[in-house]
Amino acid sequence: MMERYLIKVLGRVQGVGFRYFAQSLAGTYSITGTVKNCEDATVRIEAQGEEKNLNKFLAEIRKGNRFVKVEDIVAKKIPTADNEKSFKIVY
């Protein structure tokens, strides 16, 4: 079943390639949506896909990588977006 989440990511997530990291993971797990840096030093993600793929995506986001250090993730379900085809970085 298709789900969509609004996700706020806190930690060392700006200036470290996090948005590209998220975009790459989204491609791996067939996730559509957007990722954007926020003025409060967090990153906002809207992610849509099959629930099992979203769970894998979130688990990988939580792990981060050698540059990214995620301290917390806040996720809530939001209505799905029809006809969304890709995962984009928003500037």
Curated annotation (Swiss-Prot):
Gene3D superfamilies: 3.30.70.100. The keyword Hydrolase applies. It comes from the Bacteria. It catalyses: an acyl phosphate + H2O = a carboxylate + phosphate + H(+). GO terms for molecular function: acylphosphatase activity. It is an enzyme of class 3 (hydrolase). Pfam families: Acylphosphatase. The active site is at residues 19, 37. Keywords: Hydrolase. Residues 4-91 form the Acylphosphatase-like domain. Its EC number is 3.6.1.7. PROSITE patterns: ACYLPHOSPHATASE_1, ACYLPHOSPHATASE_3. Disulfide bonds: none annotated. PANTHER family: ACYLPHOSPHATASE (PTHR47268:SF4). Belongs to the acylphosphatase family. This is Acylphosphatase. The gene is acyP.
